[in-house]
Amino acid sequence: MRIEEDLKLGFKDVLIRPKRSTLKSRSDVELERQFTFKHSGQSWSGVPIIAANMDTVGTFSMASALASFDILTAVHKHYSVEEWQAFINNSSADVLKHVMVSTGTSDADFEKTKQILDLNPALNFVCIDVANGYSEHFVQFVAKAREAWPTKTICAGNVVTGEMCEELILSGADIVKVGIGPGSVCTTRVKTGVGYPQLSAVIECADAAHGLGGMIISDGGCTTPGDVAKAFGGGADFVMLGGMLAGHEESGGRIVEENGEKFMLFYGMSSESAMKRHVGGVAEYRAAEGKTVKLPLRGPVENTARDILGGLRSACTYVGASRLKELTKRTTFIRVQEQENRIFNNL
């Protein structure tokens, strides 16, 4: 046993220090990034925000809606091959280039993902997703996926430390997904005592990944557009959002009515709700590590997408970054004990 003495920080612990800027307008900011990935050799351009691969966020409807904003969607793994075929038949090539195919690590997951990828060559992203990316089995699956799909861009996670980030990249991942426990409906930290404050995890993993020519996704912990800006400022190449995109018409959650008001259910993928829906319940040997919440209906996702992108552009103007690519170089974080004036928050 040992204790690391240096303090680790989350998004709520910092603000971005403003700097002199020559930008005249938020409209001058370029949010689109262009990437060429280490192993696949594929190039991609777009806004590097990703709708999370949760079945109450990462839906086909969400992918179609967010593609118009140049935003990616990691489509959840619970769609059948037939449902994928129907989606592909009704989608343009532009929508498909903004789609990630999500998978677990079982043999059945591998075979199903292979069938989905064979449906259309425009499906270039594979998202290999488990709660704990530290197992040897997971690393072996990433290597197996790289061998099977040498030209596909593979993202893999989740991890929170530099050495594991490096191992996944060396095993074949182009992008590593970073985050254990920061999500709005994740209870891993309180059920297990395991986790890592998200901003510090992003900073550490970005440094490790970029040294090897890899990239990272900051997954979880964002509650406002300002948090998205902080994640990019900390070195994230992509930012994945779950709760911020939940509760919309495209989100796919079940709608319930209570006292005449309608709500949409949103739950973590290790919650009792998710496990009952997909595997029949919580196994005797494990605990649920997610919760279920009822969200007021939020309408179409386009309004939220515009709000996020507008906040990100504004953050860039405050530090003089004419492109999103420059934001991390222009970012200085200051540690704080307050984020906002909350006097009217309950009104």
Swiss-Prot record:
Organism: Escherichia coli O157:H7
UniProt keyword Metal-binding, yes or no: yes
Described purpose of this protein according to its UniProt entry: Catalyzes the irreversible NADPH-dependent deamination of GMP to IMP. It functions in the conversion of nucleobase, nucleoside and nucleotide derivatives of G to A nucleotides, and in maintaining the intracellular balance of A and G nucleotides.
Residues at which K(+) binds: 181, 183
Subunit structure, interactors included: Homotetramer.
GO BP term, example: purine nucleotide metabolic process
Protein name: GMP reductase
Bridged cysteine pairs (disulfide): none
Amino-acid positions noted as binding NADP(+) in the UniProt annotation, renumbered to this chain: 108-131, 216-239
GO cellular component, one term: cytosol
Active site (record annotation): 186 (thioimidate intermediate)
PROSITE patterns assigned to the protein according to its UniProt record, in alphabetical order: IMP_DH_GMP_RED (PS00487)
InterPro entries the record matches: Aldolase_TIM, GMP_reductase, GMPR, IMP_DH/GMP_Rdtase_CS, IMP_DH_GMPRt
Gene3D superfamilies: Aldolase class I
NCBIfam families: GMP_reduct_1 (TIGR01305), PRK05096.1 (NF003470)
Assigned protein family: Belongs to the IMPDH/GMPR family. GuaC type 1 subfamily.
E.C. designation(s): 1.7.1.7
One Pfam match: IMPDH
Catalytic reaction equation(s): IMP + NH4(+) + NADP(+) = GMP + NADPH + 2 H(+)
GO molecular function: GMP reductase activity; metal ion binding
UniProt key word NADP: yes
Alphabetically ordered keywords of this record: Metal-binding, NADP, Oxidoreductase, Potassium
